[in-house]
Amino acid sequence: MKNLMRTVTLFLFTITGVFAQLPEPGFTIDGSTAIVITDPQNDFLSPDGVAWGAVGQSVQENNTIENLETIFKLSEQYNIPVFISPHYYYEHDHVWKFEGTLEKLMHNISMFDRGDQLNVEGFEGSGADWLPRYKKYIEKDRVVVTSPHKVFGSESNDLALQLRKQGVDKVILAGMSGNLCAESHMRELVENGFEVAVVGDATASAKLPGLDGDQAAQTNYKMISSRVFTTDELVKELKMHPVR
């Protein structure tokens, strides 16, 4: 029995040591790099948004709104292409026969609602619209707005196609919400052969009783992506190694 306990203790100590020293693959920003931002929309980022009660604390703690704006500015300063993956729900999406927990919640609170693909009536200033301070960056010809994702990941939109068609192999990922859409995009992009870095403090996640989405997201960014930047680290990286 004592030998068994020693073996278990040694095993746990070894495993803990391994995970405490995770490798750092690194991420070099070059001409094949793009920025992908998920859901920079009012329902997540405005205090008037329907999800603010869940994500607002994390948005404020991470300084997410300001950090996302810094990333938009960096994209212009260093001529890095930007791809926006938005989240929209049309009227026909509300007749789905089954939903997951967060899908059901989003539908119940009319999150990201629009009439249909061609109907923009009531869109301006709605929860599905861009946060106003980002519009001057997004509404430029150099920014690609993909078709909407419908659940969390980019499997249901054309993000990967748009990236590949512009010769993008590397992605700097940021946006909302951290443990859902941003993390799901990270996973799908990695599975599709993209090299992915995440700007951890340019995301935010729901914090609910007994649940900390931001902590979960930051853990998975570290374990899955090639590098996790802070916004300040990304600024310094681009100053030291401008994109060529």
Language model segments and positions:
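Sec-dependent signal peptide recognition
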Residues: 2-10
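Short active-site-proximal "capping" loops at secondary-structure junctions
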Residues: 41-43, 50-52, 82, 88-90
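Acidic/histidine-rich helix-loop elements
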Residues: 45-61
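Active-site-adjacent betaalpha module
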Residues: 20-34, 43, 61, 74-78, ...
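Short hydrophobic beta-strand that contains or immediately precedes a catalytic carboxylate
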Residues: 36-38
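Von Willebrand factor
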Residues: 67-94
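Hydrophobic h-region of N-terminal signal peptides that target proteins for export
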Residues: 11-19
